[in-house]
């Protein structure tokens, strides 16, 4: 009897525990159904239809009947503002198709545009395509005789020098009826030249002509292109208005062949050359950098030694202090010409307190066979301690006009052995 009572009590306790466990499982599943995101009460019917179809498709994949919510939680996708809904047959709604990559109607033109400014995408913004101002046709210096535009190209294979004569502007002509022409020389050959057509009754002639010089590749970098602009009067006599000297160097012939070059006309020096020739150069002093700059431009009327085989002519520039040698630089050599053109720049370090004791010596030398050099002429510029006359005036003008290039001609004096 006692054993039967014990079995009965144990069965009752086991049944209660089983009932409690089943109740807990049902409670957890019942609570899980309320953890999903709740949709708003006033929803768009199209939105409800959209999610109903979404739910039906989910049931098909998960195997859960439509009348029962799946046990796997899901997240409601965000609503897309601004989408258009179109009605379908049967009372359903669908989203109208849209471009997956919508293009903005307007976009800012530039970073500096105002908040209200906008331009259509695909349109050209002219501010982005503005070319830099061409300053070649403005800024004519005082006393300018005119300006000439031209182009130079050298064809290595055919050894031809192509020169394009483009135009001239601001020519200073003696009369209103201006008729101009241009003669082209390839120095040092002064005898042969090419000539442009005469432009009548115009002070800003447009030539647009091409000329060809046959010159070897070995000597082209030693040549100088000379443009002489003439006024033709009623008697057909030629009056020189100005000239341009353009050295043909390696850096000039390299690069873009269609680059347009312009130069201001220079007056021809009518003074006869001195006994040993003349040299033209510029001086400039920068007191802030303590830098003395020398630009060797050209020489003329050099007395070459005919009894020797001439190879080339160059200029040696020496900086002296208290008549003691400090530093020396030299130009490139020009094939034996009595009128060589250099256009080369040199700089020397000179303190301000040394300007009263420093001087510059420029010597023109002729190189012969065997690399022997013979002086052709010499000039010294500096303070009163070393020079007089034009050489002293040139030095003084350089000091009065700091950071400016002061250009002058100087007569070469008797050479001394270097």
From Swiss-Prot:
Record SUPFAM superfamilies: C2 domain (Calcium/lipid-binding domain, CaLB)
Record membrane topology: Single-pass type III membrane protein
Cytoplasmic side: 28-418
Keyword set includes DNA-binding: no
Subcellular location: Membrane
Keywords: Membrane, Repeat, Signal-anchor, Transmembrane, Transmembrane helix
GO cellular component, as recorded: membrane
Record flagged with keyword Repeat: yes
Ranges where the C2 domain occurs: 144-261, 275-396
Extracellular side: 1-4
Organs and tissues of expression: Isoform 1 and isoform 2 are expressed in heart, lung, skeletal muscle and testis; not detected in brain, liver and kidney. Isoform 1 is expressed in spleen.
Domain of life (superkingdom): Eukaryota
Transmembrane segments: 5-27
Family: Belongs to the synaptotagmin family.
PANTHER family: SYNAPTOTAGMIN, SYNAPTOTAGMIN-15-RELATED
Function field: May be involved in the trafficking and exocytosis of secretory vesicles in non-neuronal tissues.
Subunit structure: Homodimer.
Protein name (Swiss-Prot/TrEMBL): Synaptotagmin-15
Source species of the chain: Mus musculus
